[in-house]
Amino acid sequence: YLLHYQREATGEVIERSVNARGLFRRIAETNWDYAEPGALFWDRIEGWNLLTNTEEFSYAGVNPCAEEPLPAGGSCLLGSINLSEFVQNPFTDHAEFDFEGLKRCVDVSVRALNEVLEEGLPLHPLQEQRESVAKWRQIGLGIMGLADCLIKLGLTYGEEDAVEMCDNIGFAMADSAIAASAMLAKEKGPFDACNTEEIMSTPYFAANTSEKTKELVRKYGLRNSQLLTIAPTGTLSTMMGISGGIEPVYANYYERKTESLHGTDVYYKVYTKIVESYMKQHGLKSDAELPDYFVTAMTLDYRQRIDMQSVWQTHIDASISSTVNVPNRFTVEETENLYMYAYEKGLKGITIFRDGCRRIGILNTSEKKEAKKLSAGEGLKRGEILLVTDDVVGKKRKLTTGCGSLHCIALFDPHTGALLETYLSKGSTGGCNNFMVGLSRMISISARGGIDIETIVDQLNSSGSCPSY
């Protein structure tokens, strides 16, 4: 297969011939090992939205989480609705979803996001951004709490009845959002580049609007060229104690460790909020008594997980940021199959995270404990520091920085390979050198205190550094 890329600035054409199947295998192997790269299916991104037939419009890329494809100068403006709050009579045989309440919420939310867009329009730093936002007026209304919603309804995530419920909720959300944007267009005018005929001729519009909404758009146009997206909502959902985005519950519980000054660690089982609520309401003593519809990311078949995202993508004109969490035993071949199934089901993008892979995840289970990290001082009590002898092996590097040469020495245990000490020196005096000496001492004492090198590196990477480095 011939890869082709043209640099707009210079007109330079870059081409490279690759073995497509071999490249796909390499992508799957890398993802299995490190949870990157994710996949974007660009034909689906361009072919399933409100601007498919608008020739002057083109996507320049996506935001980092990939749920919001944007043109050059586009702005990411998102908001999410908690679906679990629309379940009436939760955890009972009479539980039902409040569709009318959702429609009212969507109408208010679309208006609210448009108000935020107006407020922020003059604040964008670049003229290109201000012009793009004014011309296309893209917003991204999404959802969170889906897994909690299904549990309250007594539906099993990924099963046929849950997929059907999501299909109904998704259509109601899309139809209501488009209608709300049309009513805003009536009040304040459509977005600058709005071409009603082109919008109404798109497959996405035809599949997601009622006759009443079609008539509103035909009459008034739309205030926004893009309306719906689904973000991961990791911080929002954690703050609210609900499931994130369209994700299943990651685990029914996690273990919390309390450390004492006497070298004794105590572990507590902490239940996910939705699990805790159900157990209290039904008087359960253990999660083993939970009904079968309490599935988790690690017990769910990945095809069911893809099926859920597929039905939601049918109703989302932007995209969906979503991670398929798979167990540690997941193979490279299964990773390939997952990518292919995602494409076949019409997804715009997908990310795969194998529990226990080399990349440290935000959420983890205990299954990966078999992949032990290298650390010095196995069995140290809390507060103990390992003494280092001369029996070490070392590596020396000289790095060139914006402030001159930096001399680096790392010493390791010759038997285990664990880091023991580091020495950093600028070879000069002054505050920069003093900082490097202090940093190397802190790295050394952390390593000799039993902290593995991956954790040390992760902490330092997250803190940033002087731009000259």
Locate each region found by the language model:
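Catalytic alpha/beta core of large soluble enzyme barrels
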Residues: 60, 66-69, 113, 117-121, ...
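Short, Gly/Pro- and small/polar-rich lid/capping loops
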Residues: 211-219, 364-405
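Short acidic-hydrophobic surface loop/beta-edge motif
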Residues: 1-6, 228, 392-401
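Internal maturation/activation junctions in enzymes
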Residues: 105-130, 134, 156-233, 320-321, ...
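Glycine-rich phosphate/pyrophosphate-binding loops
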Residues: 153-159, 320-322, 346-359, 448-463
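Function-dense linear segments that define catalytic or interfacial modules
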Residues: 31-133, 143-153, 242, 247-282, ...
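C-terminal binding/interaction regions
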Residues: 463-469
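Conserved, charged catalytic cores of large soluble enzymes
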Residues: 1-57, 80, 88-93, 143-213
